[in-house]
A protein has these predicted regions:
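Juxtamembrane intracellular "pre-TM" segments in multi-pass secondary transporters
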Residues: 11-30, 219-264
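Cytoplasmic helix-loop-helix junction between adjacent transmembrane helices
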Residues: 129-167
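C-terminal ends and interior cores of transmembrane alpha-helices
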Residues: 107-121, 334-351
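Extracytoplasmic gate region of multi-pass secondary transporters
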Residues: 54-58, 257-305, 309, 371, ...
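Helix-loop-helix hairpin linking two adjacent transmembrane segments in secondary transporters
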Residues: 164-220
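Conserved MFS/SLC helix-loop-helix module at the cytosolic interface between two early adjacent transmembrane helices
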Residues: 85-123
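Cytoplasmic membrane-interface "Motif A"-like loop-to-helix N-cap segments
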Residues: 95-106, 320-335
């Protein structure tokens, strides 16, 4: 059955009128319907691109605006909470329409992303401006799936929703592609994040112009009815002439706050925790856990979102062909659960780039297989209660998913509290460690470094005067004896001829006159006698000192340093000697670098040790979310077996023909 499209825009003529009055009085032919669906998907992709663009440069934003990871996550959390109430406002589109909201939102967000947010120079300006954008996008991202539903009968609903769900994923994919191709491996400045926002905003303005010129929507009398196949078109247009819109829209939330709507919305929201974690933190996760550059982390996003897009569209086509949704949700949930467990176990290990790429691709395929049929089934469940309240049902879902994200992002910094040192300091610490390997050695030998710092003056002297230290070591006995017998040696040095003459005699044969002279030279009286006795008793030690007197004289200028060096424990000297090359290299590190490492290296090392386990815990929570989703599937409308679904479609077609016959008989 066919029908011609009458005046397409509610009887309005002229360019200006068409920019304001966008309602179609009759259901469009297939070509125009596909065009409007494609335009809605384009708007959705653009809105999500603008929403997610910060993820590609999140590490640069944190560093440039001096944000902690916790502050960043809390910002995202409250952004979603604010967007949740924007989503509730979007429920009014059941009464006032969708297209103008989408067009306004595209213009508003493009201006903010291109020109306002990039001018933020502190974290509070960035946050508040992001909140404003979040409210507008919360409204638009409920209006767009409502438009998708309006232009797609149930028989093609999964395919249409598959294309719509490509919106967030294609938005993520564009973020990753643009980021991996425009963000250098080593950005020249942390302010480079504004570059990505400028690109995104300019593209957004182009999409706004296209939508402003061409986007349309169905009139309320057309969209507020259930359409199973395109063959229902004539019946819908006939019924539209007598539909009571006010009655259909009375007490909308009371009509839809039911277990099948609410629990299903909660379930898919917790299933998508892993998706929103990837959107917000994939770059942070890959750079801090596996050490990838921002460029390579965005490259992994290409794999994740590219495969997700293919899965979303393919499963939509297959679900429509087989006429069932639930088996695909189960299959996708199981695949997602298994792959996510394998993926989370990689933390703390060293998987290759392509190992992670394949896991991300498979995980995204599983989520896509589950999500597209859920979107189709959810809108069909809402239609089963009241087809006039699609936007209200999607607003409830939009509110719930943003509240769930808000709560999860509040929880995330509690579970993962190790990211801030890695994001804020990890890059500099790693770069310094690569440039100065001795810093890495110092980190693994703290006691050696501490001892070297404690005795730095003594060890520095030893390193600068190795021959002096070697001589002092060689003549250590003589040096000790020189100090011990200093008075005796002073007397001998002052009276060399007298002691040379005395050396010709034994102590018992020295002439009395010579003995008297010796006693007088030694200080006279008992003092002189005692000193001579000491010389006589320690003749060998004193002779040893005299034998190397020239060598000891060369060491005399360093006596203070050698005395201080003698106070250093031998074990410290041994360790310093064994590690002299490393300590010498460490001494050449600029003081500013050493100070930075001293302030932050320990925190970075501790965080790096804790972070993999904390991320695993979070991903286990995400696994639980997918399992809860699997348990909720029976609540949704729809058959499990294709033959049962085909029978329902045949019965509906018979009803349509009967209704058309009645309308024809009464006209």
């Amino acid at each position: 059955m066919t029908a011609t499209t009458a005046d397409p825009v509610s009887g309005q003529r002229g360019l200006f009128s068409s920019l304001i009055h966008r309602q179609l009085d009759s259901y469009p032919d297939t070509g125009m319907r596909v065009f409007y669906l494609a335009l809605t998907v384009l708007a959705t992709v653009m809105l999500y691109y603008e929403l997610y663009v910060g993820g590609s440069v999140s590490t640069l934003i944190l560093a440039n605006l001096h944000m902690s990871f916790t502050f960043y996550v809390i910002t995202l959390a409250f952004g979603n909470l604010i967007g949740a109430f924007g989503s509730l406002f979007a429920g009014l589109t059941d009464r006032y329409g969708r297209a103008n909201l989408v067009v306004f939102g595209l213009f508003f967000t493009a201006i903010f992303v291109a020109f306002v947010i990039p001018n933020a120079t502190n974290k509070w300006a960035f946050t508040i401006e992001g909140f404003v954008v979040g409210v507008v996008e919360g409204i638009c991202l409920v209006a767009t799936p409502a438009l998708i539903r309006d232009f797609s009968p149930q028989v093609g609903r999964a395919t249409a929703m598959g294309f719509w769900t490509c919106g967030p994923v294609l938005g993520s994919l564009i973020v990753a592609i643009v980021g991996s191709n425009t963000v250098p491996a080593v950005p020249s400045s942390t302010r480079f994040w504004t570059h990505e926002y400028h690109i995104c905003g300019i593209v957004g303005l182009v999409v706004f112009v296209i939508a402003a010129l061409f986007l349309r929507e169905l009139s309320p009398r057309l969209r507020d009815q259930l359409m199973v196949t395109m063959r229902d078109r004539a019946l819908i247009e006939a019924r539209a002439k007598g539909i009571d819109i006010e009655a259909a829209l009375r007490r909308p939330f009371r009509q839809l706050v039911k277990p099948d709507v609410i629990i299903s919305a909660i379930a898919v929201s917790v299933m998508l925790l892993i998706y929103y974690t990837a959107v917000g933190f994939l770059v942070i996760y890959m750079t801090t856990i596996f050490g990838f550059s921002v460029k390579d982390a965005n490259g992994l996003g290409n794999w994740e979102w590219g495969f997700n897009v293919v899965a979303l569209i393919a499963v939509g086509l297959l679900s429509d062909r087989l006429r069932v949704r639930k088996p695909f949700m189960v299959l996708g949930g199981i695949i997602g659960t298994v792959i996510l467990v394998i993926y989370l176990l990689q933390a703390g290990h060293h998987p290759s780039y392509y190992t992670l790429a394949i896991l991300l691709a498979l995980l995204s395929v599983g989520l896509g297989i589950a999500y597209t049929p859920w979107m189709a089934s959810f809108t069909e469940t809402v239609e089963d209660r009241n087809p006039a309240l699609i936007a209200t049902g999607l607003a409830i879902w939009g509110w719930i998913i943003r509240v769930i994200i808000f709560l999860s992002f509040i929880l995330l910094p509690v579970v993962i509290n190790s990211v801030t040192p890695l994001v804020n300091y990890g890059g500099t610490v790693a770069a310094d460690a690569a440039q100065y390997p001795s810093l890495v050695w110092a980190g693994s030998h703290p006691t050696v470094v501490a001892a070297a710092e404690k005795y730095s003056t003594q060890l520095g002297f030893a390193a600068a005067h190795p021959s002096v230290v070697a001589a002092a070591t060689k003549y250590s006995t003589q040096l000790a004896n020189a100090a011990k017998f200093a008075p005796e040696l002073a007397v001998i040095e002052k009276n060399p001829a007298l002691f040379a003459q005395a050396a010709k005699y034994t102590p018992t044969t020295i002439p009395p006159a010579l003995a008297a002279k010796l006693i007088a030279a030694a200080g006279g009286g008992s003092k002189g006698t005692a000193l001579l006795g000491t010389i006589d008793a320690n003749q060998a030690a004193i002779s040893g000192v005299i034998a190397v007197s020239s060598q000891l004289t060369a060491l005399a200028p360093y006596s203070a340093q050698l005395k201080a060096l003698a106070a250093v424990p031998p074990s410290v000297i041994a360790e310093a000697t064994a590690n002299s090359a490393e300590l010498a290299a460490l001494a050449k590190v600029p003081p500013s670098v050493s100070a930075y490492m001293a302030a932050h290296a320990s925190a970075v090392t501790t965080a790096a040790a804790k972070s993999p386990g904390q991320w695993k815990t979070w991903y286990w929570i995400c696994v639980g979310g997918i399992i809860f989703f699997l348990l909720s599937i029976p609540l949704l409308r729809g058959r499990w077996r294709p033959r049962d679904a085909k029978r329902d479609e045949e019965e509906h077609e018979a009803m349509v023909q009967a209704e058309l016959a009645k309308l024809g008989a009464t006209s």
